[in-house]
Every structure is written in C-alpha cells, then in structure tokens.
Design a protein with these regions (language model features):
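Short, charged, low-complexity patches
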Residues: 164, 278-287
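Beta-lactam-recognizing serine transpeptidase/beta-lactamase-like catalytic domain environment
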Residues: 1-33, 38-274, 314-317
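Short, gly/Ser/Thr-rich active-site loops of penicillin-recognizing serine hydrolases
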Residues: 193-195, 200, 285-317
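Intrinsically disordered, low-complexity acidic/polar segments
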Residues: 266, 278-280, 296
Length: 317
C-alpha cells in the first residue's frame, strides 16, 4: 500500500502530459487583455484619461506602422470610454493609451517612457514578485519593451495563474495585495489545532483614487453583464477575458480573471487554458467555479457532457 511501481512513476515523470508540472504556479504566459485593468489604472492615475475620455476604434491603430489591429477588425468599436473599453476589451483604446504614455516633452514617442509607467503600476499590483504561495512558483516578468503592445498584455509580460489571481484579488478589494496561501491550519495527530493561517497583507495601493477603482469595477461588471455566458446566475460577478498570442503555429492561450459577488467580493478567480483557442472557454470555467463555490449542490451539473457547447457566449477576447 502507498507505493508506486518505479517504471510507472518514470512513465508519468517523463510523459508528454507533464502531470507533475504545476501549471498554475510554474507555467507562464502573456496575460493578454486581463492586463488592461493595470493599463487603465496607469492611464487614470497619470492623467492620460479620465471617465469622459474617448478613443475611436476603427479596428486598427494607424498612428504607427505596421498598424496593430483590434480583435474586432475589420470592424470597429467606434468611440469608447474607459469603462466601455474594459466591457468590450477594445485593443485600440489601449494601443492609444500605451502610445500616449510614451510621448516625451518634445512630442516624440519613446516606448521606454510608456513601459516604465506600466511597470510602475503592475508592480503596485504585486506582479514584480512571486505571490507568496508555499509551493514552487516561477518568477513573474513585467514587459520592458513595446509600450503599445504591452498595454494590452503582450510585449514581454509573462505571469503565472497564481500571480494573476493575486492581481485580480487586489482589483476586487480596491488595492490590498495579499500573499497567497494554501494552508488553512495545522493540527497534531490527535486533531488539536497547532496554528491557524490566513493570508497576510503584502502591500496596499493607498495612492489610487477611489474614482479609479469605481471605473475599473464598472467596466468589469459590464463585461459580465453583456455576456450570455453569465446569464441566470443568482449572484453578481465582475470579470475580464484575455487572449494571449503564442506564435502562428499554435492556438492562442485564453484567460479569465474575475471576482464575485461584484459588490462585496468573497471569491477571486483566475483561469488560463494553454492553447485554448477561445476566451469563452476560460470564462465558462470561471463562471462554473463561482457557481459551485456559492452553490455546492450544482457540482453534478459539470459532468453532464456539455463541454462541447462551451465558449459560445463571449466574442473577441
């Protein structure tokens, strides 16, 4: 009992499935559009945008060449403010913001100026350091080049799901960055409590204006409200999807970050499906996690064979 055949263990350890590789804490990808709350924070706090600033999306950002595209191209979103930009995940809004943050005192574009501002706010959200979880975790990487692409979560941004979870937790609670923990309590052999554990505060984002949090929360709430994926829930949610490009030979990675209930969050969620094609798949997993958390009796619904219908409720990224 409690033993494993060495040949079988070797097969598991060397197999292509990599079952001993903890993807949640060790696998890193670009965050895609889940990064846009950081870009919005930077833009609002640095004065590049406010609640009334709009950017017109024609489907392509033509200020630079080659011109990066919005996911809706060849269509366009039209004029959007920051709340609508999060709701619709408009890339052009954030291309423009990443460009504007890189304009120097002479009116010239300097990508480093833009990435420095994005890095500042990403670090405030804890993305310049590990999450504190008690198992091995890969070191995060905040993008240091291409401010236009970095503003939509591309560039050289590279994070684990655990790090994205800590970030969205800080979004949900308006600026408290916690160290993650997997340990609830320790007991002795007789079940007597040795120590209770709780997440410890890493840092607080006290300098961020309450109006900034309000706008970001509104955008994430409207993203969920406008998606049929989340229809019929008996609790409110806020969230943001993401699609991270790998290369032309592989499907995109897809992500979802969110929290619930939207008004008084109890739960934060981060989902990534490597090479997952459609962010709707990640969104539905995030939704189902929340459903089971608040209604444990619904767990049986997740094994009804309906996985083939996933991903139909969300367009774009």
């Amino acid at each position: 009992a409690n033993t494993m055949d060495s040949a079988y263990y070797n097969q598991l350890n060397t197999g292509r499935a990599n079952i001993f590789y903890n993807r949640a804490t060790q696998e890193k990808t670009a965050p895609g559009s889940t990064f846009k709350m950081i870009s919005a924070t930077a833009g609002l706090e640095e004065g590049y945008i406010d609640a009334y600033t709009t950017t017109y999306c024609s489907g392509s950002f033509n200020t630079v060449t080659p011109s990066p595209k919005c996911w809706i191209y060849p269509g366009g979103h039209g004029a959007l403010n920051v709340v609508q930009s999060l709701q619709h995940s408009c890339n052009v809004f954030y291309y423009q913001l990443g460009y504007n943050m890189g304009i120097d005192s002479n009116g010239n574009y300097d990508s480093d100026l833009g990435t420095d501002k994005l890095r500042k706010y990403a670090a405030m959200y804890g993305l310049d350091r590990k999450s504190g979880v008690e198992i091995p975790e890969a070191a995060p990487q905040i993008s240091d080049e291409y401010s236009i692409q970095s503003a939509i979560g591309q560039g050289t941004n590279n994070f684990t799901v655990s790090q994205l979870n800590r970030y969205v937790t800080a979004v949900a609670n308006s600026g408290t960055v916690y160290d993650l923990t997997l340990i609830d309590k320790t007991t002795d052999a007789a079940g007597n409590l040795i120590k209770d554990y709780s997440a410890e505060v890493d840092s607080t984002m006290d300098e961020i204006n309450s109006s900034t949090w309000d706008l970001i929360h509104q955008g994430m709430e409207q993203m969920v409200a406008s998606s049929t994926t989340f229809t019929g829930l008996d609790f409110s949610m806020a969230g943001k999807t993401g699609t991270a490009q790998h290369n032309e030979l592989h499907a995109d990675h897809v992500l979802f970050v969110g929290y619930a209930p939207a008004e008084q969050p109890q739960l934060s969620i981060a989902v990534r499906i490597t090479y997952g094609y459609n962010s709707g798949y990640a969104s539905e997993i995030g939704r189902d996690i929340a459903k089971v958390y608040f209604n444990p009796e619904t767990a049986g619904e997740l094994i009804t064979g309906s996985a083939a219908n996933l991903g139909e409720g969300i367009a774009g990224d």
